């Protein structure tokens, strides 16, 4: 490789910065990777859910799964459960799990589900055993299984601050990442207009060939220096505020296998279970709900879900955000990753997976020469504009299908707020179920089966392609799911048992190492 782009400089730490440093250092060991971060700028750190992609990312970086689970106070995430999104009734609940539905043509599966259960049983519960496992707070794997493998597909719930610290330690100790704690006060460009060096408050400078902007919503490089514009998406995604709270839990309490998203009159609440606490937050639109009412909704939820907890003794962290993304993510020799690239409500935990996909795309096509920069940037920008459009569509899908009557929910169904691309897909899906042909990218963030779980979980009409009488193969597949559900429910440990046993083993191993 030419030495023209060997010096990679990352500005900003947190999950985005340190994932960038570690993944690029691991995938491109010929690079000289430097991360520059101010020592006194806090990270947002509320995104505590990952997709299954994080397993491959950790393996690539070289972080052991058991070490990650212990160091990051992490637990297993097997999907999301949505309560109250359809009509707000007591039994209004559906799952979007990570494991795909039973392997058979979806039109046949829908026919078998409808015939067998009359649509009284949940769609997800009929087509994947993951729901039986989640309902029982079970882990997706046994301790004896090889790392990063499981009986079911899974990601993680985690402490974002601890993940950043683990990545920083691993990157500097094992991957050769240089860590510079300093305030960036300016940027110098070369004669060709490309970024050339960062100017530090100390008077020093850090030179680079390629730069990654992980400065969060400040967007110091991609926004302030390069002037890349912002595409506002608040016309589609209304929520612009959140209250976040960390609620301690009693030792031995159950740990949920899924993120729980509970709808309220002007937004929704998240609930994420970790071994030592629950991360709970209230997402809302300031157009439809006051901050005081949001705090009351959050307090009422905590009181109802965690008896004995005193929400009045806990101060929520107040967040305001703009929904949207950069018009370009890559300009010249600078790539925006994380919040500097864009932000949308954390309804389906898209933040970390967008970071991972951005870094994968960069590592796969890292520039060797200045002449390649425009073409690589154009290709990257086209791909991630597509990905952002699909994320906006998928999150909007959750609102469009709701039948709730509050003004907020009625506004969400206003056709003027529904992207043309989503409206076209919904029309198509009245004819046939979502398929790979509808979502053509290789690394779709939300695949056809994700669309299916939300559509049929929320009561979308069965498509015209559904057969009037189910075939034998589809019925057999659903019977296999039922049997597999019983088998896994009997064989898998609870999340609490798995994680407590793992932490005890990690503690014992550390003590033995200290003695040795």
Q: Predicted regions: what is each one?
A:
Residues 6-31:
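N-terminal Rossmann-like FAD-binding beta1-loop-alpha1 element of flavoenzymes
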Residues 25-46:
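Glycine-rich FAD pyrophosphate-binding loop
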Residues 46-134:
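Dinucleotide-binding Rossmann-like beta1-alpha1 core, especially the glycine-rich loop
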Residues 93-186:
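Conserved N-terminal helical subregion
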Residues 145-294, 359:
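Predominantly flavin-linked oxidoreductase catalytic cores and closely associated redox partners
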Residues 264-320, 340-353, 365:
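Conserved FAD/dinucleotide-binding core of flavoprotein oxidoreductases
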Residues 318-336, 342:
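FAD-binding beta-loop-beta segment adjacent to the flavin cofactor pocket
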Residues 364-516:
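Long, low-complexity C-terminal extensions of enzymes
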């Amino acid at each position: 490789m030419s030495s023209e782009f060997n010096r990679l400089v990352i500005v900003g730490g947190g999950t985005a910065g340190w994932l960038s440093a570690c993944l690029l250092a691991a995938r491109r060991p010929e690079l000289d990777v430097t991360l520059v971060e101010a020592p006194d700028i806090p990270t947002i750190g509320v995104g505590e859910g990952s997709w299954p992609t994080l397993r491959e990312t950790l393996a690539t970086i070289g972080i052991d799964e058991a070490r990650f689970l212990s160091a990051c106070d992490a637990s297993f995430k097997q999907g999301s459960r949505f309560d109250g999104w359809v009509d707000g009734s007591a039994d209004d609940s559906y799952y979007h799990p990570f494991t795909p539905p039973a392997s058979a043509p979806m039109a046949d599966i829908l026919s078998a589900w409808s015939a067998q259960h009359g649509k009284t049983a949940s769609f997800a519960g009929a087509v994947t055993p993951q729901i039986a496992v989640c309902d029982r707070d079970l882990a997706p794997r046994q301790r004896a299984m090889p790392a990063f493998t499981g009986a079911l597909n899974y990601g993680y719930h985690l402490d974002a601050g601890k993940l950043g610290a683990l990545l920083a330690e691993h990157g500097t100790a094992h991957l050769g990442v240089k860590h510079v704690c300093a305030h960036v006060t300016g940027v110098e460009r070369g004669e060709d207009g490309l970024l050339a060096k960062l100017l530090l408050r100390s008077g020093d400078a850090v030179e680079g060939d390629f730069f990654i902007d992980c400065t969060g919503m400040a967007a110091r490089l991609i926004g302030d220096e390069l002037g890349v514009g912002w595409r506002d998406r608040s016309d589609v995604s209304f929520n612009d505020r959140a209250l976040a709270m960390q609620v301690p839990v009693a030792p031995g309490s159950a740990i949920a296998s899924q993120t729980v998203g509970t709808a309220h009159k002007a937004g929704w609440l998240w609930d994420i279970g970790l071994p030592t606490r629950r991360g709970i937050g209230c997402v809302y639109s300031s157009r439809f709900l006051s901050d005081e009412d949001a705090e009351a909704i959050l307090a009422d939820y905590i009181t109802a879900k965690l008896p004995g907890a005193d929400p009045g003794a806990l101060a929520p962290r107040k967040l305001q955000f703009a929904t949207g993304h950069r018009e370009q993510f890559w300009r010249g020799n600078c790539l925006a990753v994380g919040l500097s690239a864009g932000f949308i409500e954390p309804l389906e935990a898209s933040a970390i997976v967008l970071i991972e996909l951005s870094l994968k795309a960069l590592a796969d096509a890292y520039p060797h020469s200045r002449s390649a920069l425009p073409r690589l940037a154009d290709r990257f920008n086209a791909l991630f504009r597509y990905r952002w459009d699909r994320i906006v569509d998928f999150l909007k899908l959750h609102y469009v299908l709701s039948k709730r009557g509050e003004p907020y929910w009625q506004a969400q169904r206003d056709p003027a707020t529904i992207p043309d691309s989503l409206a076209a897909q919904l029309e198509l899906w009245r004819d046939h179920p979502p398929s790979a042909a509808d979502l053509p990218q290789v690394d779709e963030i939300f695949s056809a089966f994700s669309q299916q779980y939300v559509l049929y979980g929320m009561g979308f009409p069965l498509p015209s392609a559904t057969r009037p009488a189910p075939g034998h193969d589809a019925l057999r597949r659903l019977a296999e799911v039922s049997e597999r559900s019983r088998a896994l429910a009997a064989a898998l440990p609870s999340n609490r048992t798995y994680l407590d046993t793992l932490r005890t083993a990690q503690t014992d191993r550390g003590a033995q190492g200290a003695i040795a």
